[in-house]
Amino acid sequence: MKVLRAWLLCLLMLGLALRGAASRTHRHSMEIRTPDINPAWYASRGIRPVGRFGRRRATLGDVPKPGLRPRLTCFPLEGGAMSSQDG
């Protein structure tokens, strides 16, 4: 019984210590950004700095053309199954 009480007392003290330590930690603001960091430095090394420097707009090559249909990436069904386009 004494071992159980000692164990619970240790758990209680550990919980209080961790709770107190968490309240004293310094929380950094995500809005503080260092202006001397250059996103081109990362991009020239093949690193995409999307999270740090904001979202990049899609380039014109990435936008699908309105007249072209997207390619379907399906495999033909084996057996006697007919597709809905065959009628």
Curated annotation (Swiss-Prot):
UniProt note on tissues of expression: Medulla oblongata and hypothalamus.
GO cellular component: cytoplasm; extracellular region
Signal peptide limits: 1-22
InterPro entries in the record: PrRP
Domain of life: Eukaryota
Keywords: Amidation, Cleavage on pair of basic residues, Hormone, Secreted, Signal
Tagged with keyword Repeat: no
Segments traversing the membrane: none
Subcellular location: Secreted
Post-translational modification Phenylalanine amide, affected residues: 53
Record propeptide residues: 58-87
GO molecular function, one term: hormone activity
GO biological process: autonomic nervous system development; energy reserve metabolic process; fat cell differentiation; feeding behavior; G protein-coupled receptor signaling pathway; lipid metabolic process; reduction of food intake in response to dietary excess; regulation of multicellular organism growth
Job of this protein: Stimulates prolactin (PRL) release and regulates the expression of prolactin through its receptor GPR10. May stimulate lactotrophs directly to secrete PRL.
Protein name: Prolactin-releasing peptide
